[in-house]
């Protein structure tokens, strides 16, 4: 059975037991490497992040459909009728479906090259003296993982249900992109032009580093997790904090003053998605199902209200939706029913 192959190590923790064991959680646990793994309007808290680092984590605005929550479309033309396809919106407004490139290399536009295997690379040299930049937008649907190489050599891994807008070639003063969803960046070094990732909740400024950004709307917070180097986080009314490796800085999206909270964390847990892993630490069923919705491209509908349960574990990337739900169901008080692309969650009958 495939269920028997699921590497989940799932451990259920009741709410009461969680409170007793919370301080005992080992956040420095080691994990294997894996493979694969926007937005309701809420109070807009701008967070500035200046990075002098080698590796850090961030995540940007995303959305999980919970009981029919509506999703704001940034590029309507590209979204209509193309929800399951990877779309590239060119500077001319033309929308190109690049989901199923049959060739290993396809020239799209003045040096842009498309490679098969969910990878897009820009090889045009930077326009250091060009007055107006030409922007492209890459739209990644649910259930898809994509690799983008920008014109300066910066590598970006995009998680499911994400969008990134960027210049085809960067200008002479800075390199700036905007992100919705989640992206893991390996920024090419350039001491003369800082690299900026702009999101609805935070900005990240670097010269050459590797990081992952996270401000999914449905998570209720924006945060930065640092693996190497130093990061300066600024938010609210001029408050700023510097964090060191093994720590995270987070801002509650509902905090009007946008105070920054710094704490220790397991960095490998937060960057696991880039290598194709579900990684949970005392995660509620609600949190798990949010990720299930994004990764498997399904809508989750919770038909009843019941007490939350918490889990610790991980799942390899080749597990089917049915197998994952079967494992969760075997150690949970809920049952699942899958009809096409909808997962119904029900409380088990006694």
Where do the protein language model's features map onto the residues?
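Alpha-helix initiation and N-capping motif
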Residues: 3, 27-31, 266-267
């Amino acid at each position: 059975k495939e269920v028997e192959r699921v590497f989940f190590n799932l451990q259920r923790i009741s709410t009461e037991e969680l409170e007793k064991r919370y301080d005992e959680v080992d956040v420095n646990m080691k994990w294997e490497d894996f493979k694969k793994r926007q937005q309701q309007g809420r109070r807009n808290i701008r967070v500035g992040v200046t990075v002098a680092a080698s590796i850090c984590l961030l995540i940007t605005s995303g959305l999980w459909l919970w009981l029919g929550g509506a999703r704001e479309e940034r590029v309507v033309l590209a979204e209509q009728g193309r929800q399951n396809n990877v779309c590239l919106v060119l500077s001319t407004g033309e929308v190109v479906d690049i989901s199923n490139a049959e060739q290993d290399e396809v020239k799209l536009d003045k040096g842009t090259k498309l490679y098969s295997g969910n990878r897009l690379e820009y090889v045009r040299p930077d326009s250091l003296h060009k007055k107006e930049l030409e922007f492209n937008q890459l739209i990644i649907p649910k259930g898809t993982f994509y690799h983008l190489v920008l014109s300066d050599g910066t590598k970006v891994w995009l998680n499911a249900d994400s969008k990134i807008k960027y210049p085809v070639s960067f200008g002479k003063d800075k390199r700036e992109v905007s992100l919705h969803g989640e992206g893991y960046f390996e920024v090419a070094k350039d001491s003369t032009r800082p690299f900026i990732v702009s999101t609805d909740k935070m900005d990240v400024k670097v010269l050459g580093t590797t990081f992952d950004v996270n401000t999914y709307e449905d998570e209720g917070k924006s945060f930065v997790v640092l693996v190497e180097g130093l990061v300066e986080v600024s938010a609210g009314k001029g408050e700023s904090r510097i964090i060191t490796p093994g720590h995270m800085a987070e801002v509650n999206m509902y905090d009007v003053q946008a105070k920054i909270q710094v704490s220790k964390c397991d960095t490998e847990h937060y960057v696991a998605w880039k290598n194709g892993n579900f990684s949970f630490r005392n995660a509620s069923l609600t949190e798990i199902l949010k990720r299930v919705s994004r990764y498997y491209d399904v809508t989750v509908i919770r038909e009843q209200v019941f007490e939350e349960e918490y889990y610790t574990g991980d799942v390899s990337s080749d597990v089917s939706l049915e197998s994952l739900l079967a494992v969760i169901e075997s150690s949970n008080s809920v049952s699942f029913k899958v009809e096409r692309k909808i997962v119904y969650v029900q409380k088990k009958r006694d």
